[in-house]
Amino acid sequence: MNENLFSSFITPTLMGLPIIILIIMFPPVIMTSSKRLVNNRFHTFQQWLIKLITKQMMAIHSPKGRTWSLMLASLIIFIGSTNLLGLLPHTFTPTTQLSMNLGMAIPPWAGAVILGFRHKMKDSLAHFLPQGTPIPLIPMLVIIETISLFIQPMALAVRLTANITAGHLLMHLIGGATLVLTSISLPTAMITFIILIMLTILEFAVALIQAYVFTLLVSLYLHDNT
């Protein structure tokens, strides 16, 4: 029996309708604010995490750039929680979809670029032509810098998609090998099972690291334009 390795990355449907919107909305639902006078441990941890993220991300920013702190904190929490929820068995990981990751990368990148051209026109245009460039190389460098600017959101999305997809595929392959080896060689199956556990722990770290890297790069793009 042949199994499609990429079947877990296909957008799930309910009665023929895609339910990815419900999946995307799930992390914000579990991160709702508390209406209690005294917060429980979960909401206390949530507030501490937001303050820590804001402090780390906004240290290099000007007052104008710090107005993006809530958006960046929401972005890293959303990506991190979505990646972690995708590690649960029989679940769908939205961040394995390039279209969704592009949807998260393009708006903040475009907002940062527009903000730069609006408030720092000369500095933004100076990025296209480094100082001291020989005159014959000016047209080529302008084209290269323009292409590199528009590649930034694609690089963000592809990096996140590739890392999350690769980890899930490895877990799928090693898990399948473990099931097959249980009926062939139990000692070998135990070794592959230990490898699977170690890989799962590594994927937990990768899920959080990729959320941090994605948001950090958005923060750096914002810093370059404010």
UniProtKB/Swiss-Prot annotation:
Catalysis: reaction(s): H(+)(in) = H(+)(out)
Molecular functions (GO terms): proton channel activity; proton-transporting ATP synthase activity, rotational mechanism
Statement: the UniProt record of this protein carries the keyword Ion transport: yes
UniProt keyword list: ATP synthesis, CF(0), Hydrogen ion transport, Ion transport, Membrane, Mitochondrion, Mitochondrion inner membrane, Transmembrane, Transmembrane helix, Transport
InterPro entries, per the entry: ATP_synth_F0_asu, ATP_synth_F0_asu_AS, ATP_synth_F0_asu_bact/mt, F0_ATP_A_sf
One Pfam family of this chain: ATP-synt_A
Protein name: ATP synthase F(0) complex subunit a
Annotated source species: Cricetulus griseus (Chinese hamster)
